[in-house]
Amino acid sequence: MNYYIIGIGAAIIIITALLYWLYSYIFPEKSKVSSKNYLFNTGIRSIPLDELKNPTSKTYSIELWLYINTLPKTETAIFSYSPSQSVSLIIDPHNILTFKNTQRKEQSMKITNIPLRRWVYIVINVKYNLVEMYMDGKLVDSGKISSRYINSISYEDSITFGSIDAYIAGMNRNTKLLDLETIRKQYYKDKNDLRH
């Protein structure tokens, strides 16, 4: 009788652990970087990395909704990791959105022709030195960026926002990569929410 109870107890513990692992794999942890719309041209804001879950992880994804009113006159960061300046998301006067390691400018991923005056859903997946960029649920660029720079993020860093005529909403830093199906589902779900 006692072996039977011990066996059932062990089975319940194992099943609970498996369900937790499966849940955490399907639904990665998110760190809300912004829970409201920010108007960038009111100044620079920063968020300390110690407020994020697993901030120095070499595998992560960043998702955000971006609304650009007008293009800047010079290359301007939407966000960057400071003070290391290891990675930045930058918009330039030629309407090119670039995710790059700031130390080696030739290593970058780009999205061209960002629509102005409408919400655009951007996802950046980073796995060591492999980077993928998505816009509105579609893969637009992928490649490698030197892991020496892109993964040199430290707890002393913060995410610093630039000063441009734009809004950002729902920025999340996920502890895992987002797959294409998840990106598309989130795009269509949030797209409907932003219309209201």
Where are the regions that the model predicts?
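Extracellular glycan-associated modules
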Residues: 1-196
